[in-house]
Amino acid sequence: MGTTAITNGLAARDSKTPIYYIHTSGTGILTYGDIDRFTYGELSLKVFDDWDGVAELTSLPDHAPHRNVDKLVLNAGNLDPALVKTAIVCPPCIYGPGRGPGNTVSMQIPGLAALTLRQGHGVQVGEGETHWSSVHVQDLSDVYLKLVEAAAAGGGDASWGAQGYYFAEAGDIVWGEVGQLVAQIAHKHGFIDSEKVVSYSADEVDAMHAHGSMLWGASSRSKAIRAGKVLGWVPTRPALEETVEDSLLIEAKRLELVPGHAKVAAGDA
């Protein structure tokens, strides 16, 4: 595992110069409650925050997604906090076009768009009441930039180590509402015959898309406080709903669909 090699290297350093390690986790780690209870598609009122609730975030159950890797990073930062300064950035649902040379699309919105096009109707898990927090990829990149700038300045005002856990979000979305929006846009462009949304069980959606029950049916609500307080971060890019149409059109092009085209077979995508 790459993180194991990195953290082992940090522990083995024989230097008195501080080193900074910024790790990317993900708020899939917060879905463990619905996964444990099998309450997919249901409303959860639990909201995690990275300021008053940071101790909870750094001691989540070991079986939570990503938790094993988070622990490696946290332990590395605890060995010698003066010399190894770690930060964990934990993004929620990421949307919007990337600016890098490689992959420029994320997972959840493009995945739901592609699934809608394949099935020929909108998709939701259970009652569709699951909330996820979300962030535009370019707002997210600002968090990394500000952390790197702080590290270059000797740590700056940023939090590191046990306190260095950063959410990055610009509000919540409700997956049933997003599924409806995707269906409306797909129908407007003639890719599907109606705006109908069909509810599937967790097992059914997993059979159609790997980890679909977690991606669109398990709650992940986060409140980004730390980045604003210590880094001055403020999200300014368009809301997720404003980017859904572009995401769907990209997926339609990838699937070689044209307006009015029948749905593609699930095995063709």
Predicted feature descriptions by range:
Residues M1-D49:
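NAD(P)-cofactor binding segment of oxidoreductase domains
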Residues A82, G96-P110, L147-Y165:
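Glycine/proline-rich active-site loop of Rossmann-fold NAD(P)-dependent oxidoreductases
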Residues I88, N103-I109, S133-S141, L145, ...:
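Conserved loop-to-helix N-cap of the C-terminal "lid" that shapes the substrate pocket in Rossmann-like
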Residues L140-Y144, A168, V178, A227, ...:
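Non-catalytic, hydrophobic alpha-helical segments
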Residues R237-A269:
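Amphipathic terminal alpha-helices
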